[in-house]
Amino acid sequence: MTASRRFRRYLAMPLAFAAMLGFASAAELNPAAVVYKLPDQIPWGPLNAAGAQSAVVVGDPSKPGFYMVYNKWTKGNHFSRPHFHPNDRYIVVLQGTWWVGSGPKFDPQNGTVPMPAGSFVTHYGKQVHWDGAKDEDTILLIMGEGPATSTLAEEK
């Protein structure tokens, strides 16, 4: 095999591979079969007074029925006050470390347990808890049955 022929063969292989990758990334999904949002398309709401943002993924948490919500706690020792919900909630920690406390005594420094990314937590309905982030942003996926209200423990 001549040098020019080898050169063309070596040049053709990466070009063919690049073309295959280009075709693979150009695929389109049928919206009747699959609906998706990429991370930069998630509709995050405004930052609330406790230092958290939410984005509804599925359903409507204010109405009866199943819902899924992303919740992002910003770093800087931001915590909710002790509260409870009427229904069970199921939470997956997607990013960061989420700090969880239970009971009416609010003590973020000594009364919380760290839940690293990958943790699964159940908040039982009508049970007092509080939670937040300390030194890193934390993203949660919260699932439950609506309506998803929150009542401060002092109001119980």
Predicted regions and their residues:
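Bacterial N-terminal signal peptides
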Residues: 12-22
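A short, N-terminal "cap"/entry segment at the start of jelly-roll beta-barrel domains
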Residues: 25-70, 155-156
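Double-stranded beta-helix
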Residues: 33-35, 110, 128-156
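Short beta-strand His + acidic residue motifs that chelate non-heme Fe in jelly-roll/DSBH
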Residues: 80-82, 100-101, 123, 128-134
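Conserved short histidine dyad/triad with adjacent acidic residue
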Residues: 67-85, 124-126
